[in-house]
A protein has these predicted regions:
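Matrix-facing interhelical linker segments
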Residues: 1-323
Length: 323
């Protein structure tokens, strides 16, 4: 009986510890998506109807966005999008398990096969990732018990009629592919150079020179991955509409938002770019962000990615060495 009790306790800890960690860290990732999606032009411009845009004032840092979410939406605002994000992580985490179990057979495990698996996985879950980002940034309150209503709020009429358009969002697939290629090549480079940081005990087996090179390489990597992440968030939250007049798009948006409840009682947490003048592609998104918001916007909260990279590459393996 004691063996059965010990096993039950072990299984409980195995499930509860990752769950608690996930719930504790989710608000930080939710805030980074909100911060990178926030449209903050250097000057106020008129839209096609002659109305002035109203960017969120005072949100010029990651922690300012976190404070704003807390003030306007409360704790619930930090957990927007947790349901689709959980489905996304469950799918991505299941792939290595299926490979180890032999359900998914991979004859060769070289760079190209790893890249192909990563690309296939990300393309499959692309709609869920889009829905997750939109759920995190929407000004509306999404009920947990009514996914149909939430999807109707997050997706445009055109996207609900033609779901495959999510894959064809201008520039989105390019940003996803570049992010996967970049991440796969970085890990392959570390293993090729035989860095102990790519092993289970990085801090114990790394020389100061190796750690220094790794830290510099990770900074360069973040300078590439951060702009890709910003572009991916911006393109994901941009809904697809047919090429019609701006007034028709506005009426469609009003019809879609009927019956919804705003999360913030006073104002929107995130200032989103007008859907009447969308980004036309990957490079157009970069060009407009630079022209309208400045180069620094492409690197907003770059330190967040760097801390996460160091944590997953150095600190986490070091902590695992004690168990």
């Amino acid at each position: 009986m004691s063996g059965l009790a010990d096993r039950a306790l072990l299984y409980t800890l195995f499930i509860s510890i990752p769950t608690i960690s996930y719930l504790a860290t989710f608000p930080f990732f939710s805030t980074i998506v909100k911060y990178r999606s926030n449209y903050s032009p250097k000057r106020i411009e008129l839209d096609q109807e002659g109305n002035r845009s109203h960017p969120v004032a005072g949100v010029n840092s990651y922690f300012a966005m976190m404070k704003r979410v807390k003030q306007l939406e409360g704790q619930a605002g930090f957990y927007k999008g947790i349901v689709p994000c959980s489905l996304l992580l469950a799918f991505l985490r299941s792939i290595p398990v299926l490979i180890r179990a032999g359900i998914i057979v991979i004859r060769k495990r070289d760079l190209w096969h790893s890249l192909a698996i990563a690309l296939f996985s990300e393309i499959v879950v692309l709609p869920i990732r889009v829905i997750t980002f939109r759920a995190m940034t929407t000004p509306y309150r999404l009920p947990w018990y009514n996914p149909i209503f939430s999807l109707r709020t997050l997706l445009s009429v055109t996207e609900r009629k033609h779901p495959w358009l999510l894959f064809l969002t201008p520039g989105l697939l390019v940003s996803v592919v570049l992010s996967i290629v970049h991440g796969t090549l970085v890990m392959s480079l570390l293993k090729t150079l035989s860095f102990p940081v790519a092993t289970r005990y990085p801090l114990a087996r790394s020389s100061p020179t190796q750690l220094g090179i790794y830290l510099i390489a990770s900074i360069v990597s973040v300078l590439i991955s951060c702009p890709l992440s910003v572009v991916q968030v911006r393109l994901s939250i941009q809904r697809n509409h047919p090429p019609r007049d701006y007034e028709i798009i506005e009426r469609e948006g009003q019809a879609e938002s009927s019956g919804v409840v705003y999360s913030g009682a006073e104002e929107d947490v995130v200032s989103l770019r007008s859907e009447g003048d969308p980004y036309k592609g990957f490079f157009d998104c970069i060009r407009r962000i630079v022209n309208e918001e400045g180069y620094s916007r492409l690197l907003c909260a770059w330190w967040f990615d760097l801390v996460f990279l160091w944590y997953s590459g150095l600190i986490m393996p070091w902590l695992q060495s004690f168990f």
